[in-house]
Amino acid sequence: MLTHLKIFVVEQISETIVITPGGDGNGFRYNDLHSETNAIRGHLMKPGSKHLVVDLSKMDYFGSEFIGALVSMLREVKNRGNKACFCSANAQMLGVLQNMSLFKLWPHYVTRDEAVAAAGAE
């Protein structure tokens, strides 16, 4: 599992990868974001890693680079015919994601448990 990351905590639950970005969505180095996104995308290509849940419970804000990184991971999973979603966003984050129409592409679940269950449902 990916344990050396600074921005994301990565967990695997059955065939679902749960990533939890932590801290300030603008308080990171671009190189770290790019490197970690690529590491997670590589992990998602491995057998047994099909679905993706992005847990936003620790985020209050993120900038365009961060959104782009999340979208690249979500899109890759969806393009392979697997499930991807968001969960646990606060009211401010929900507004940002709704304004960007991202929920038309990937659903949002109120709790992490709901998201993991939905992702794993065949």
Where are these regions (language model features)?
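General structural signal for secondary-structure boundaries
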Residues: E11, G63-E65, E114
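Amphipathic alpha-helical interaction surfaces in cytosolic regulatory modules
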Residues: G25-W106
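Short acidic-hydrophobic, aromatic-tinged amphipathic segments that line or gate anion-handling sites
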Residues: L105-A115
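A short, charged, amphipathic alpha-helix used as a generic interaction element across diverse proteins
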Residues: A115-E122
